[in-house]
Each structure stands twice: as C-alpha cells, then as structure tokens.
C-alpha cells in the first residue's frame, strides 16, 4: 500500500515558509471533474475573476481570468481545477493578467471520449493560447500541471516566455508497475483519499484537506484513470536540458511526492533555472498561499526588468 501511495501521489497536484535559492528577485459519467463552477460570459479586468468558455479543436475549455497586463496561464493538477488559482489571477495586475484553465474533462470544461494525457493536455493549452491570441505567456503549472508544461516547453519552445514548475516531477523515478492495471475508476478515487492525507505533513489540521476528501466522490473516475496512467508513463528526464526559457522551480521541503531531490534534479537539467524551497508538503498552495503569492510575484516582476 505504501508503494501505491507513493506512486499515485506523485501524480497528484500540489496545492507555499520558504528558503529562496534565486536572486531577490460530478459525478461518475458527468462532464467534469473537480469543483462545481458557474460559467460567466466575460472576464473582469481586476478584482474577482470571471469564467467563460473557449472552444478549441473539438472541445470546449473553461477558463477563469482577471487582471490586466502580460498573460500568465495557470495549469492545475490531477485532482483539482482552475479554482485553486482564483486568488492569484488579479494579484499582479496591472502588470500581469491571470488566466487559469480547466483541462479537458475537469471543472466546467467538456469531457470528450478520450485525450486525458500529458501530451494532449499540452496541445490543448497551445490551442487555447492561439484562440486567445497569446503568443508567449508565462506558464505556471502545479504537480501534473508542471509535467504538462515541461512537455509543452519541449514541443513548443517558441511559445514560452517563462516557466514556473511547482511541486512537480520530470518522471525520473521508479513508478508502481501495477498502476496501469488498476481498472476500476472507483479504485482510483479510493486510493486518492489516502494519498491526499499522506501528501500533507503529519500534524496538518484536517480542515486543510477535508474539502478535497469530500469532493472525491464527485470526481470522474474515467478521466482520473487515464490522466494518472499517462502520468505514470510520462518521462522527460534527460530531455528537459533542451528547455531554454527562464524557469523557476518551487518545492516543499516536506514533500514526499515531488521531493526536493527531484526539484534539484530538474534545476540541474535546465540551464539558469532558479529554485525556491518552502517549509511545506506537497499541497503547498493550501499550506502557505501567501508565501506562494509573494514568491510568484517577485519572480514575475523580475521577468519585467
């Protein structure tokens, strides 16, 4: 069981005190996975984010956006949605405009028959940027989102202004060989309950993870199964040395999922990459949201200099 917890949890999303190493600067069968959300026709330039739908290549994606300025696109992990980024979208306006996307099958985005893979998610993100007339955004990815963005940066290097990789992995680890054989979508949800708890440091107040546990039963197991299986086979280790975009890596010192050792390994492979380490576990943005907001803001402002 410990092996299963370690492996599937590496596939889960990081939800930021910290040591800086860079210069101061739905139910089963439904169409979504994650939080219940309400669509809105337009985005506010500042303040509370607004939601709207964007049609791309046969699938409709739901996005949250707020603020003005240069675009920053946020990508969530395997068991969350765009809502985890809502407090950050207008935080850096008027210099940066925040856009958070529900990946296909998640949140308010449509769920096609297939395509819930790292590769397809990255293609969808480029199609979304095209539809929004965004050439080179800053990309921020958490856990699975960070895996997607490493693939995106390799496949579309000219579409990346900068990367922020949060609590993620390059796939350089031993994966549970039994993971692809877990066939029942409900099994993924049951395993995920344990993983969520195990991903927080001992002594974490249950209030931080209880909302996630309560939403497990609404997650679409089919989407979760395909995404987790894709994550179990994804591996860009040794190839990300080709990434030339400015990169910030963020990791929790107590993260047993995407460990500090993995983060340091990614830093060594990407020339000039900067690293920030927080005193948190895997769900960093739940444990220290204000710390994460500050670090991301410092990095974004540094890009503008």
What does each model-identified segment do?
Residues 254-258:
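Acidic catalytic loop of the alpha/beta-hydrolase fold
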Residues 147-155, 160-190:
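Flexible "cap/lid" loop of the alpha/beta hydrolase fold
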Residues 2, 6-72, 95-96, 218, ...:
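Alpha/beta-hydrolase fold catalytic core
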Residues 173-174, 179, 186-242:
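Conserved alpha/beta-hydrolase catalytic His-Asp/Glu region
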Residues 281-293:
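Catalytic histidine-centered segment of alpha/beta-hydrolase-like enzymes
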Residues 243, 249-251:
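Short beta-strand/loop motif that positions the catalytic acidic residue
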Residues 64, 90, 100-140, 144, ...:
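Active-site loop/oxyanion-hole signature of alpha/beta-hydrolase fold enzymes
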Residues 59-108:
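Conserved HGGG/HGGXW glycine-rich cap/lid loop of the alpha/beta-hydrolase fold
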